Amino acid sequence: MNINREEIVELTETQGKAWGINHVRRLLALIDVIGEDQDYDKDVVWVATHLHDWGGYGEWKQPGVDHVERSLQVAGDYMKEQGYPEDFLDHVMECIGTHHSGDPNRSIEAILLSDADALDFLGVIGVLRIF
């Protein structure tokens, strides 16, 4: 499978500005730490991490529409246009759709994204409280 990482990064930077891409970089760094001893699909996590907030960015944002729901729409459309395999697309969509969820039946990839997103939201003080 071909993941056009340059295009995804460019779209995240263009639409999400500095906050979007910096948020993604922090999440990927956190996932490297919290997922260190885990067996997970790094491609799914990489794509889901970049796309999980797309519905809240720039021209993709729709007032009154939850950013998670909108991200599912935007990311789904993008991945279909790019020809991602259905099982990969479904896995990424699960990660995006549950990144604010406490559903215990999520995949390890979805849990890693959700946990990293929560830790990033808490900030440094919040992270230090955990350890």
Residue ranges and their predicted role:
Residues 2-31, 53-63:
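Active-site flanking loop/helix segments enriched in acidic
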Residues 9, 28, 32, 72, ...:
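Amphipathic alpha-helical segments within well-ordered protein domains
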Residues 38, 43-131:
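Divalent metal-dependent catalytic cores for phosphoryl transfer on phosphate-bearing substrates
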